[in-house]
Amino acid sequence: MVKTFDIVVFPGDYGGPEVLGEIQSQYEQEVTFNLKYHLLGGASFDAHGTPIADEALTDAKAASAVLLGAVGGPAWDKAPIPVESGLGRLRKALDAFGNLRPVKFIHPILTETSALKEQVCRGADLLIIRELTGGIYYGARQEHDGTLNAASDLDHYERAQVQRVARLAGTLAMSTQPPTPITSLDKANLLAACGRLWRGVVEETIRREFPDVELKHMLIDTAAMTLGCRPTKLNGIVLTSNMFGDIISDQASAIPGSLGLLPSASLCAIPGGESGGCVHGIYEPVHGSAPDIAGQGIINPTGMILSVAMMLRYSLDMPAAATAVETAVSRVIERGGRTRDVGGTTSTAEFGDQVVACLRENTEDK
């Protein structure tokens, strides 16, 4: 029986949908992808007067997964509504609570493009899990009154929010053999919400529900220093709160050498729960809209293509296909396929075509 997956696509660079087409051709006896395209961010604001239309939200909630390009740019800096808020509405509508950002070298040769010395970064392999629904970004906010004298933001977390993302981390840790160690980052020496509450709930949840998982706690400032000088000490799962995760995951992008190499997933449930192996999620490359190079055909599509691999693994329960995509990307890089951001001359389209060609080679070799 052929499975049908509805996937909502908010366009960015098109490496992702192209790879999906090739996956469908390889698994045509097993799967069909129905791609529905919608606008998000500035493009949606120009067309509909809102960063995301209600129809797009409805389709996204009904879909198996969402594939997302980059949002925003200087053309909308003076828009009456921040166009980036469309992504926030999408995450809230889908209850996306756990952001996964793997930080590693898809091929060892890329250690030479890292911002860190090769002997420092070689072997780095982290999965940063960032809580998305709580913390200072969602707490009560008091803007200054125009005099620039005072303003405030409330950092607020509830037990259930921390517990849910800790369970996500524990579940993913237990999916490997041996279980992947977890390092939880906080500021427990000074702060209440993303400090002592966070540490206490994570400690209780992992020790009680995932006793075989090695857990350690680290202050966020210590983690930032460690990431810059000995990143392999953080190998495994790195679990942290919304704001700390926002900052530390961007810092971690210096390890592989380009934001364009990194994928991400924002999951709406814990894999292996009531939904079995499939969970709804939003998949997007880490890089922004890159307005300075947009339209030149030189954006690195690796992050988008690897985001498709994450979608295949977490939302579509196609782990073999996910591994095939990752292997194809690694093989293209090994053969010299590199975009400008990592020292090459390969265009966006050429890189995507080469990945598709490698996928076909893998099929023919079977």
Curated annotation (Swiss-Prot):
<dbReference type="Pfam" id="PF00180">
    <property type="entry name" value="Iso_dh"/>
</dbReference>
<comment type="similarity">
    <text>Belongs to the isocitrate and isopropylmalate dehydrogenases family.</text>
</comment>
<keyword id="KW-0464">Manganese</keyword>
<keyword id="KW-0100">Branched-chain amino acid biosynthesis</keyword>
<keyword id="KW-0028">Amino-acid biosynthesis</keyword>
<dbReference type="GO" id="GO:0005829">
    <property type="term" value="C:cytosol"/>
</dbReference>
<dbReference type="GO" id="GO:0009098">
    <property type="term" value="P:L-leucine biosynthetic process"/>
</dbReference>
<protein>
    <recommendedName>
        <fullName>Isopropyl malate dehydrogenase htyC</fullName>
        <ecNumber>1.1.1.85</ecNumber>
    </recommendedName>
</protein>
<comment type="subunit">
    <text>Homodimer.</text>
</comment>
<comment type="pathway">
    <text>Antifungal biosynthesis.</text>
</comment>
<dbReference type="InterPro" id="IPR019818">
    <property type="entry name" value="IsoCit/isopropylmalate_DH_CS"/>
</dbReference>
<keyword id="KW-0560">Oxidoreductase</keyword>
<feature type="site" description="Critical for catalysis">
    <location>
        <position position="137"/>
    </location>
</feature>
<feature type="binding site">
    <location>
        <begin position="277"/>
        <end position="282"/>
    </location>
    <ligand>
        <name>NADP(+)</name>
    </ligand>
</feature>
<keyword id="KW-0520">NAD</keyword>
<keyword id="KW-0521">NADP</keyword>
<dbReference type="GO" id="GO:0000287">
    <property type="term" value="F:magnesium ion binding"/>
</dbReference>
<feature type="binding site">
    <location>
        <position position="221"/>
    </location>
    <ligand>
        <name>Mg(2+)</name>
    </ligand>
</feature>
<keyword id="KW-0460">Magnesium</keyword>
<comment type="function">
    <text>Isopropyl malate dehydrogenase; part of the gene cluster that mediates the de novo generation of L-homotyrosine from acetyl-CoA and 4-hydroxyphenyl-pyruvate. L-homotyrosine is a building block of echinocandin B, a fungal lipidated cyclic hexapeptide that acts as an antifungal agent. This is followed by isomerization of 2-(4-hydroxy-benzyl)-malate to 3-(4-hydroxybenzyl)-malate by htyD.</text>
</comment>
<feature type="binding site">
    <location>
        <position position="91"/>
    </location>
    <ligand>
        <name>substrate</name>
    </ligand>
</feature>
<keyword id="KW-0479">Metal-binding</keyword>
<dbReference type="InterPro" id="IPR024084">
    <property type="entry name" value="IsoPropMal-DH-like_dom"/>
</dbReference>
<dbReference type="GO" id="GO:0051287">
    <property type="term" value="F:NAD binding"/>
</dbReference>
<feature type="binding site">
    <location>
        <position position="130"/>
    </location>
    <ligand>
        <name>substrate</name>
    </ligand>
</feature>
<dbReference type="GO" id="GO:0003862">
    <property type="term" value="F:3-isopropylmalate dehydrogenase activity"/>
</dbReference>
<feature type="binding site">
    <location>
        <position position="246"/>
    </location>
    <ligand>
        <name>Mg(2+)</name>
    </ligand>
</feature>
<keyword id="KW-0432">Leucine biosynthesis</keyword>
<dbReference type="InterPro" id="IPR004429">
    <property type="entry name" value="Isopropylmalate_DH"/>
</dbReference>
<feature type="site" description="Critical for catalysis">
    <location>
        <position position="187"/>
    </location>
</feature>
<feature type="binding site">
    <location>
        <position position="250"/>
    </location>
    <ligand>
        <name>Mg(2+)</name>
    </ligand>
</feature>
<feature type="binding site">
    <location>
        <begin position="71"/>
        <end position="73"/>
    </location>
    <ligand>
        <name>NADP(+)</name>
    </ligand>
</feature>
